[in-house]
Amino acid sequence: ESVAIAEPMLGEVGDDATVINDDKKAVAQAITDEACKVAGYDSMEAAAEDGTAFVFMGHGTSHTANVTYDQMQTQMGDLGFTNAFIGTVEGEPEDTACEEVIAKVKDAGFKKVVLRPLMVVAGDHANNDMAGDDEDSWKSQFEASGAFDSVDCQVRAASSFFQTPSRAMNAFAAPPSSPGQP
């Protein structure tokens, strides 16, 4: 067994929502591929044609790193995924709050919604805040809006697209440095 230390999964934060990088692109592609597969679609485009939006719910933070969520939304757009939306359970940044995301999905005209955590571990936030039966869960709020024909939840962590935890770590770990190299 070994321990590897890697860069953050989403790479550098950057200064504003337009700063994206190869790490964000790789994560965006991986999570959308997996979400489509689980939902029975061949691609994000096929899901969009069927009227399905995917909402990826992250944690959120009041730290300046919260721009990462807007950067992920920018990355989804750059990939052409008009049916991918980024939200946060803590509602920070504000445009990622549940009610804001509901409005965006509704305004975009999608009638089917798939909620999925944008978290390494699918724990309490995924099971309760996203998929729970309480009226304040994301699922309940999307349903209560009356704007959607269906709201489904995929309670799977962002790391689930890797077969083992070691593959997840290795996928984002920097290659070992050569002797004499930092």
Segment roles from a protein language model:
Residues 1-175, 180-182:
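Extended amphipathic ligand-handling, pore-lining, and cofactor/metal-binding catalytic surfaces
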